[in-house]
Amino acid sequence: MSMSDPIADLLTRIRNAQMVAKPTVMVPSSKVKVAIAQVLKDEGYIDGFQVKTEAGKSELEIALKYYAGRPVIERIERVSRPGLRVYKGRDAIPQVMNGLGVAIVTTPKGVMTDRKARATGVGGEVLCYVA
């Protein structure tokens, strides 16, 4: 059965794994998921990730990050979804927690944070908020 929202599945798997203090989480891989994982790594929300291929299926293994026994990601939520896409222009890209968190945005120039999208001067689809 096909998945209707693979990005929401990625975020939910990360959230659930952190609630039970798992060191890693495995999700089916795609280019967008790898780009989201790269943004999370660059922003310091995860320790790292790698793409593993077994029996022709590619999976993304994400190493979760904890500080003093608590997950670094306090909140991760989907914004744009298949039933209601959320697009913002370069001037309307939202800040998360007054700049303490990040909004992950997919733009014509790739997947990036809200700060980088504003600095680059591009808008796009707001995928999720991370804090």
Swiss-Prot record:
Keywords: Ribonucleoprotein, Ribosomal protein, RNA-binding, rRNA-binding. Signal peptide: none annotated. InterPro entries: Ribosomal_uS8, Ribosomal_uS8_CS, Ribosomal_uS8_sf. GO terms for cellular component: ribonucleoprotein complex; ribosome. GO terms for molecular function: rRNA binding; structural constituent of ribosome. GO terms for biological process: translation. Part of the 30S ribosomal subunit. Contacts proteins S5 and S12. One of the primary rRNA binding proteins, it binds directly to 16S rRNA central domain where it helps coordinate assembly of the platform of the 30S subunit. Belongs to the universal ribosomal protein uS8 family. This is Small ribosomal subunit protein uS8.
